[in-house]
Amino acid sequence: MNKLLIGLVNVYKKFISPILPPTCRYYPTCSSYMIDALKKHGAILGLIMGLARILRCNPFIKGGVDPVPDYFTLRRNPHPERYEDEIIAQAFHSNKK
């Protein structure tokens, strides 16, 4: 089941996403987040987390770095500054404007 869901997301990333304008306000993108959540938390919890992330991604939020947390939650990652890609995390969360 997990491989099927990851395959469906990859089909979306390869064939559907390129013809749509970029709208994701987060890093990693919602489709990459879904794949990471499926790998980290399995088919059921990963799918729920991925869908919750898609619902959070809308024009009324700021966005930013939101990696998949190590535990199941429907909320945004409370410690995005600990993201493994420090350069990207700093770019999104620096105090400089």
Curated annotation (Swiss-Prot):
This is Putative membrane protein insertion efficiency factor. InterPro entries: Membr_insert_effic_factor_YidD. It is found in: Cell membrane. It holds the Pfam family YidD. GO terms for cellular component: plasma membrane. Could be involved in insertion of integral membrane proteins into the membrane. Signal peptide: none annotated. NCBIfam families: membrane protein insertion efficiency factor YidD. It is a peripheral membrane protein. Belongs to the UPF0161 family. Keywords: Cell membrane, Membrane.
